[in-house]
Amino acid sequence: MPLSYQHFRKMLLLDEEAGPLEEELPRLADEGLNRRVAEDLNLGDLNVSIPWTHKVGNFTGLYSSTVPCFNPQWQTPSFPSIHLQEDIVDRCKQFVGPLTVNENRRLKLIMPARFYPNVTKYLPLDKGIKPYYPEYIVDHYFQTRHYLHTLWKAGILYKRESTRSASFCGSPYSWEQDLQHGRLVFQTSKRHGDKSFCPQSPGILPRSSVGPCIQSQLRKSRLGPQPAQGQLAGRQQGGSGSIRARVHPSPWGTVGVEPSGSGPTHNCASSSSSCLHQSAVRKAAYSLLSTSKGHSSSGHAVELHNFPPNSSRFQSQGPVPSCWWLQFRNSEPCSEYCLSHIVNLIEDWGPCTEHGEHRIRTPRTPARVTGGVFLVDKNPHNTTESRLVVDFSQFSRGNTRVSWPKFAVPNLQSLTNLLSSNLSWLSLDVSAAFYHLPLHPAAMPHLLVGSSGLSRYVARLSSHSRINNNQHGTMQNLHNSCSRNLYVSLMLLYKTYGRKLHLYSHPIILGFRKIPMGVGLSPFLLAQFTSAICSVVRRAFPHCLAFSYMDDVVLGAKSVQHLEALYAAVTNFLLSLGIHLNPHKTKRWGYSLNFMGYVIGSWGTLPQEHIVQKIKMCFRKLPVNRPIDWKVCQRIVGLLGFAAPFTQCGYPALMPLYACIQAKQAFTFSPTYKAFLSKQYLNLYPVARQRPGLCQVFRDATPTGWGLAIGHQRMRGTFVSPLPIHTAELLAACFARSRSGAKLIGTHNSVVLSRKYTSFPWLLGCAANWILRGTSFVYVPSALNPADDPSRGRLGLYRPLLRLPYQPTTGRTSLYADSPSVPSHLPDRVHFASPLHVAWRPP
């Protein structure tokens, strides 16, 4: 007969136990009993022949694709002109006095942030915008282009103008304009590994030299020596400044590069012009080899035509207009859905390209992207605005992956020790937190996004269109793109974007100027930045509390009036540093702080209500006696694991589920195991703050017996049969807690100290978790442990009781006070003393 739920609870000692704990508890360590219970609860039978269940409530397998939902009415969020002040360290010093070593180090990390991956894989421009919504290809293309354009205008992206230059908007930083003695300085990092062809690296070019530079001397390029007249011979054409570059000694025929420049052509100093010249010549040949549409030296879209050098058409006609969009103006409509109808709607479609306010030299940047982008809802609660998802996952994959730096995440107990108090709380919302942190321009070539232009994008995704023989953009196949769907989409989009349709239909390549969200380095940098700022705020207001995790910043003060004054002072300080706060999203929590999914009050910590509801829903939908896919089990364990510390048996109760996930086998819930878990999660107990105190209770064990020292009283006992030492130590800790009721126990066993009971026999782990809940352990060396003698059967010998003070830890959770000096032989996991214990003692 299967094990009933009531019997199982009694066995785990969760109800009033029958016999004394010293007899009952060691039985739970018995292997035979654990095996029988596992069989009764159907926990051990992992190989099942019935088909697996792949969906439980909202949980589907971890790798199943949820169908994304496109919203044609998405609004692009606005980005304020975010500019973090470069003298942030000096401003912090003015605010609080000299900074600590840790604060200094963290602020220097992000001024500017650097990113040097081992290997960067460049992808064709066609992969710039991911075809994530097959039904809404054109709408998604324009919405994404508009989002990228908005980011560029806000100074978050660089726009690649040529192989070695880029333009951007917003205020420049000093590392973007390193000028010495009037000429640009070469500052390529050795680690970057980019052998520069140009004797200058990042530095802003004078605005007048935005037009391509011309040079008449003979220079060597990758294509071999060029005759002087074959170089970029510039000529004014009706004042438009467009240039025709022709590379004669090329075995692949003639290349026509026709950008429409934005200003008159200027001659530059020979060193800089040769660099631009080489990049243009290289670029022309490079793009001819690899792609039918590339970028010229000034970053405009170029069309490449493959004509024999003596072609009559080539000589007789003027340059073909290079803009795909404007070519429709001169062509006959092919049908009622021809794009020429849209192009002829207005005379002035505006420029083919826009330039930023500042121009900067960059390391060599190919006309490629390194990651794709697409749009999703801003968050589950806000579906009116979109969010850009950038996929730079190439840096986290394969043998050349970058191992991202680790950083401290506060665990539940540390968070409770720190924040559980009778303070009033409010939380601040930093708008676009990631986009505050500037990146060094040398990182730009590794973080490229963009698009190949509307014509290629549509052509690539429509089956009837062909890009043959580099003929894309000539009249024969110009109309291949025309279709009813495209026509209707563009007509609707014209209402939204107007003449920007033309600008967005051109190819573009953009590199990140601020840290992007899709790179593993970004969370680390953001955590360092906000924790350093909070550390400064805490030292400026020692009677208050400021704490942050990523972009979530909370402030606490003893009264509401005090909190409002603190809020005003801190807000002004953050604004003076250039940090943008969203005042509409400031939340005042009263005495119960909602933070990181928890509710934290003076009574301790509990999970937030929406998580409790999710758990209830999960148990309602959980099928019994049906094998559930282990990927779905991962989702279930993720949810239950978050709330496990608030239950009686904690993580050990979930061990059967962990075992099935590890074995990649389906898991079948028996009615008893499901009832046990759902009862566990029905009553959640708060995790309380640990209190400092003096340890008066000690325990010790050997494989055959245990001993306790409770004040001046000594006790000992023996086990029926010898047990593994860790199991014996855990049992001794349980006996000490149940005999003395003390919440502070001295032990020398590291496994007991860690309070992780998942590696013990399953039943014992569950019972011990409940008995030792809320107990703190203090390390006592074996030689000084008063319980050492009783555990070995010697009751007559008395060692003096130690005065062992206990101070609860707040871990390394971004509290960077000066740590005491440590001997060099200690491991490098140093305990950072909290400044709170110096300046302000929690009530």
UniProtKB/Swiss-Prot annotation:
Domain Reverse transcriptase: 357-600
GO biological process terms, semicolon-separated: DNA replication; symbiont-mediated suppression of host innate immune response
Binding-site positions, Mg(2+): 429, 551-552
Annotated keywords: DNA replication, DNA-binding, DNA-directed DNA polymerase, Endonuclease, Host-virus interaction, Hydrolase, Inhibition of host innate immune response by virus, Inhibition of host RLR pathway by virus, Magnesium, Metal-binding, Multifunctional enzyme, Nuclease, Nucleotidyltransferase, RNA-directed DNA polymerase, Transferase, Viral immunoevasion
Catalytic activity line of the entry: DNA(n) + a 2'-deoxyribonucleoside 5'-triphosphate = DNA(n+1) + diphosphate; Endonucleolytic cleavage to 5'-phosphomonoester
Region annotation (Disordered) ranges: 219-269
Region Polymerase/reverse transcriptase domain (RT): start-end pairs: 347-690
Family the UniProt entry places it in: Belongs to the hepadnaviridae P protein family.
Domain observations: Terminal protein domain (TP) is hepadnavirus-specific. Spacer domain is highly variable and separates the TP and RT domains. Polymerase/reverse-transcriptase domain (RT) and ribonuclease H domain (RH) are similar to retrovirus reverse transcriptase/RNase H.
Additional free-text comment from the UniProt record: Hepadnaviral virions contain probably just one P protein molecule per particle.
Name this polypeptide is given: Protein P
Organism: Hepatitis B virus genotype B2 subtype adw (isolate China/patient4/1996)
